[in-house]
Amino acid sequence: MIEESVKPLNWTPAPGIGYTVVRRPDGGMHYTFTDVSHETLVHWREFALEHLLQADRLTRNLYDLRAVKEITQEAIEYGIEVNSDPSARNIRLAVVVASDEIREAIEKIPALTAPGGVEFRIFTDINEAEAWLDRPLTLMV
């Protein structure tokens, strides 16, 4: 069996942004956010939408928001925009949070997005998030 090649990440860190991203072993992306400042959100939005333009397979992504202390309305609006992209239907997304306040804010994104977007779940334990992401992707369809 020929192993499918992993797509390049095409991400470059920039001064002043509050997130990093690395390619996951399964080909998805692992984002780690430390803040959701305007600069961070603009950079993330551009990167995320660019990747969605090239989405050609089912993907598992992990967003680690445990260091984020507050989710702004702007962050929710950007999340809704990206989650509404038609290519988002190919993504299984686990979000890891550290507080009920962050969980409640993040829950607004799928609640305000038209059906058919990302398969989305929120966790407080990163190992539980990984176990959920590891389920076969064929369960999405």
Language model region names:
Residues 2-141:
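Amphipathic, Lys/Arg-enriched alpha-helical "gate/interface" segment within cytosolic domains
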